[in-house]
Amino acid sequence: MKPLTPRQQEVFDLIKSKIDETGMPPTRAEIAKELGFRSANAAEEHLKALARKQVIEMVPGASRGIRILVDNAANEEEAETGLPLIGRVAAGEPILAQEHVEAHYQVDPSMFRPQADFLLRVHGESMKNIGILDGDLLAVHKTQDVRNGQVVVARVEDDVTVKRLERKGSKVFLHAENEEFAPIEVDLAAQSLTIEGIAVGVIRNSTWM
């Protein structure tokens, strides 16, 4: 869960207090009146922001259609325990930047050796021959200390990929584990390559999603 802004926290606290007092969430108009918004539409925008941050759920077609999903939105540390799941990675941004985190999963990092630092959603079938399938969650230990033959999470220019590493002089080859995919050749003299970590385990997609 991303942290709430002060205004979002006020809206969340109002919703929770109204449910505690009356058993029902407030309407958009009631939120606007209580917090001094100019219109119910302003309250709606704050509710949408809270829904995106996964602290409430909005029920379409109901004026009081608001469900609270967490007991205490301010308790960010508790909400964000577990391994972060990384989704799409924006160009030029660190892989663990907050905007890349889709969710947190209650997985013990120490069950992997070395221990996992994050999960990466796998896209495509390029590593299927070693059991890394489309939609799986790849457990990754964040390090740049890698050896030939290890399966790595690499960033080539601005594209993130999972491949087996081979270094040859000033060139790096990123090999797929699927004969339908050609190796990715990286000339370190002309291209940017960043190793984000090594694969330390796989969680089958259907187990968690």
UniProtKB/Swiss-Prot annotation:
Substrates-to-products reaction catalysed: Hydrolysis of Ala-|-Gly bond in repressor LexA
Q: Which domain of life is it from?
A: Bacteria
* GO CC annotations, alphabetized: protein-DNA complex
Keyword tags? Autocatalytic cleavage, DNA damage, DNA repair, DNA replication, DNA-binding, Hydrolase, Repressor, SOS response, Transcription, Transcription regulation
Q: List the SUPFAM superfamilies.
A: LexA/Signal peptidase, Winged helix' DNA-binding domain
Alphabetical list of InterPro entries matching this protein: LexA, LexA-like, LexA/Signal_pep-like_sf, LexA_DNA-bd_dom, LexA_repressor, Peptidase_S24_LexA, Peptidase_S24_S26A/B/C, WH-like_DNA-bd_sf
Query: Which residues does UniProt call coiled coil?
Result: none
Under Enzyme Commission nomenclature, its number is: 3.4.21.88
Q: Which residues form the signal peptide?
A: none
Q: Where is this site: Cleavage?
A: A91, G92
**DNA-binding region located at which positions?**
28-48
The keyword DNA repair belongs to this UniProt entry's keyword annotation: yes
Catalytic-site annotation from UniProt: S126, K163
Subunit arrangement? Homodimer.
In which family does this protein belong, per the annotation? Belongs to the peptidase S24 family.
**Free-text function comment from the UniProt entry:** Represses a number of genes involved in the response to DNA damage (SOS response), including recA and lexA. In the presence of single-stranded DNA, RecA interacts with LexA causing an autocatalytic cleavage which disrupts the DNA-binding part of LexA, leading to derepression of the SOS regulon and eventually DNA repair.
Q: Which PANTHER family match?
A: LEXA REPRESSOR, LEXA REPRESSOR-RELATED
Q: What is the name listed in the Swiss-Prot or TrEMBL entry for this protein?
A: LexA repressor
Q: Can you name the source organism?
A: Vibrio cholerae serotype O1 (strain ATCC 39315 / El Tor Inaba N16961)
Name of the gene:
lexA
